Each structure stands twice: as C-alpha cells, then as structure tokens.
Amino acid sequence: MTDVETTYADFIASGRTGRRNAIHDILVSSASGNSNELALKLAGLDINKTEGEEDAQRSSTEQSGEAQGEAAKSES
C-alpha cells in the first residue's frame, strides 16, 4: 500500500490534474526543432560518392570476387 501512496503523492506534487496535461507536455517537448532545420540537415548529407571512391570500391569488389572464384575452383 505504501507504493500506491508514494505514487499518489508524486502525482499530486507534479501539478498535473490528469491525462489532458500529458499530451500538452509531449507536444511542447517535440516542438523544439522545426521542419526547416530538419530539411537543412538532410540537404547537408552527401550520399553520392565521388568517382575516385566508386573506382576504389569496384576494384576491391572485383578482387574479392576473383579470390572467391579461385577458392571455389581449388575446392572442387
């Protein structure tokens, strides 16, 4: 019973009067950032690789593919 009493005392001390105030708290905390900031951050992301990076990735992939092919031949 003491757990319930402590929870009740904490609820009374918080100043909330029910669920209707909880939604307001959630909306206020999520409104700190706006969509303009998000759009700018997303625009700053660079998902395109430069030509040098693509060539390096292709050559390493081709080399690993050749090594796997040779290993498969030696196992047979």
UniProtKB/Swiss-Prot annotation:
One of its GO terms (biological process) is regulation of G2/M transition of mitotic cell cycle. The record marks R16, R19, R20 as: Important for inhibition. GO terms for molecular function: cAMP-dependent protein kinase inhibitor activity; protein kinase A catalytic subunit binding. InterPro entries: cAMP_dep_PKI. Keywords: Acetylation, Protein kinase inhibitor. The inhibitory site contains regions very similar to the hinge regions (sites that directly interact with the enzyme active site) and 'pseudosubstrate site' of the regulatory chains; but, unlike these chains, PKI does not contain cAMP-binding sites. The arginine residues within the inhibitory site are essential for inhibition and recognition of the enzyme active site. Belongs to the PKI family. This is cAMP-dependent protein kinase inhibitor alpha. It comes from Homo sapiens.
